[in-house]
Amino acid sequence: MAHYKQKARLCAIIGAMTFAHMTAVADRIDRLTSALGRAAAWLALVVVLLQFVLVVARYLFGLGSVWLTETVIYAHAALFMLAAAWTLQVGGHVRVDIFYADASAHTKALIDLVGALFLLLPFMVVLIWLAIPYAARSWSILEHSQEASGLPVVFVLKTLIPLFALLMALQGIAQAIRAAALLRTR
């Protein structure tokens, strides 16, 4: 009987160490997504300034610029693709607050865990699986804009799709780890 108690204690210690290590991994993921999200947030300023220049050039001087218009589009796409995981981390994505807002910490953790494992992660895995060949084809031909004076870097824009999915999946893993750790302590 004492042997089983020792074994149970050892398993509990190993389990605690594993969650400690997993929480450290979640912390690293959080730092990565936070740094990328904060850096990408500056693209909002770039988008606003470039759009302002475009409007002034068009309506005051009658000038248009395809490459500047595409730069605004690319910066806008990069802003959303690179900041989405950070938005997930800080709880900025839309959710049904009717149930979630009044739920206990345990229930919220359970919802977060199930949502990450059965909704977010499978969808991101499929998106990565489909987006990598899509981006690779674009890189293989160094795809450029269909407009003559457009940007010659469509392949970079398409690379943001699997990168977005990877960052979201990583942040989903971090959320699942934190939720599982919270559920384990209850």
Across the structure, where does each feature detected by a protein language model lie?
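Alpha-helical transmembrane segments and membrane-interface helix-loop junctions
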Residues: 3-186
